[in-house]
């Protein structure tokens, strides 16, 4: 595989690690999710452009749309948690009713 | 040239003099009520002269004064018809009003606006005279509306009280519904007979008078509180007792019956309208007599009694006896006004207590009032040779011997016995037994204003029937021969009513009052009629508008169908099927560990 792909793939792995391993803030997980989406977008665009897969050119746009939706959803969940507790500490996500 | 028309016009003008003087200093004088009363008594005495002339020689007059306008082919003028009906009614009405004015000088003497009260009473009397002596329908309508307006002003005399305002409004609205019928009749006469004069109406022939007579029947239903438009009459007892005595017993409520009597040449040939009148009057008299049995307010019982007697007058018109109905109007005025004045005396003496369950033992304390109350009740029930006998017994006899609707006749007889029953109830609760009122009241009926007014009506209640029925010209021939059981019917059912009511009252006097039965609830809630009519219709329209506009369109379709249903469903299903504990970091870490392990272990392929 050429260097570009490995680079971008590494960026993806890094963001994935960042999303799976975090300490207290939920926001950092969401930020790493955005990073994953960004690296996927770049890899997809580079592959399509290099191999002249013209008909697949719409796929990065579609990916962006769904990424935006999912970011909004994640943010709304964050806002709900933050409304209840004041912060977005992940230790608050328990089943306590208060 | 005799003095017939001059005396009558003089009498009517004397009545208007205190109204004209109301813009001068006389109106603010403390003696204004006395002035009004004296004017009424002079008008009565002067109006007796034409009446005697009429009785002696049968002379009738039509006075056409002033040509107002001519609308294309119809001429409207101010004309007074002084015939049998108006000549006998005017002195009776003036006599009763004279006594009531003297009574209200005692009853309302502590009222700061007593001058205005007397002016209103006098205005009412003038409009009633206009109604009675009208020769064309336009003048009759002026009088008709005039008595309606004065009734509104007088019922709402104590306007600070919400119930009085509601009752006045109720009276005006129910009368208005009747006025629709009156206007329809006027329009029909205008279109078909080109006139509003009574003479021309009676001589032009037409094959079918159903529509105008139906309009007149509707007008009479509204004004005379027949069944269907009757709730305003018991509510009108919110006004002062003189108002109840004058308007709602003797004069205003008989205006509807008087209208039908005036049009009797049209009604004698129309069998349909007669049957309708008969059935309407029979239903009214029975229904209101049933409602009167369980009322506890003494004025309401007398109001229902008035309503029942009005139904009886309608029954009389329905069996084609307009002259008997007119005789009953005249005799009824005496004892009904006296009954109201006696109840006013009782109410005032007991410091404004109107509930008969809180009266009692007045037999020894108010002897004169007791006497007149008992005589008035006996006259009402048709005791032989008192006033009521001469009209009521004749009515029952004619109804018994005529070819009429048997059901209407039967319920009229039942209503007659119920008349005796509720009269006994009034007398038993208010007069007999031990006192149930507070003993800290000074009871004194020694005021000459009170005593003289009731005394005049008392003499009238005893003798007027005899005097009137032996002085008038013979009109329709009363039935002379009938079997003895038919002759005794009225007396028998009345005696039955008296005995039953007295027995029941005496037996149940000391018993505890149980939970009311269904019949009791029917009677004391006035047959549920006001509840249904006044409450159910507005509630229905408000409920329909709320359900369709607010709930159906807004809440359901716009709000709930898509957005809220989706979110609700999602929430319910997610809480149902999720049994996670939200340990996100653990899940993420285990995911990462699994990935790394799988990449490391499964690296060796090949």
Swiss-Prot record, chain A:
Localization annotation: Mitochondrion inner membrane
Spell out the protein name for this chain: NADH-ubiquinone oxidoreductase chain 4L
Keywords of the record: Electron transport, Membrane, Mitochondrion, Mitochondrion inner membrane, NAD, Respiratory chain, Translocase, Transmembrane, Transmembrane helix, Transport, Ubiquinone
Origin: domain of life: Eukaryota
Q: What is its EC number?
A: 7.1.1.2
Q: Cite the PANTHER family for this sequence.
A: NADH-UBIQUINONE OXIDOREDUCTASE CHAIN 4L, NADH-UBIQUINONE OXIDOREDUCTASE SUBUNIT ND4L
Q: What class of enzyme is it?
A: translocase
Q: How does it sit in the membrane?
A: Multi-pass membrane protein
- What quaternary structure, including any partners, is listed in this protein's UniProt entry? Core subunit of respiratory chain NADH dehydrogenase (Complex I) which is composed of 45 different subunits.
Function statement: Core subunit of the mitochondrial membrane respiratory chain NADH dehydrogenase (Complex I) which catalyzes electron transfer from NADH through the respiratory chain, using ubiquinone as an electron acceptor. Part of the enzyme membrane arm which is embedded in the lipid bilayer and involved in proton translocation.
Family annotation (InterPro entries): NADH_UbQ_OxRdtase_chain4L/K, NUOK/Mnh_C1-like
Reactions catalysed according to its record: a ubiquinone + NADH + 5 H(+)(in) = a ubiquinol + NAD(+) + 4 H(+)(out)
Q: Which cysteines are joined by disulfide bonds?
A: none
Q: Which Pfam families match?
A: Oxidored_q2
**Family of the protein in this entry:** Belongs to the complex I subunit 4L family.
Any single GO molecular-function term of the entry would be: NADH dehydrogenase (ubiquinone) activity
> What parts of the sequence cross the membrane?
1-21, 29-49, 61-81
GO biological process per UniProt: ATP synthesis coupled electron transport
Which lineage is the organism of this entry classified under, starting from the top rank?
Answer: Eukaryota, Metazoa, Chordata, Craniata, Vertebrata
Gene Ontology terms, cellular component aspect? mitochondrial inner membrane; respiratory chain complex I
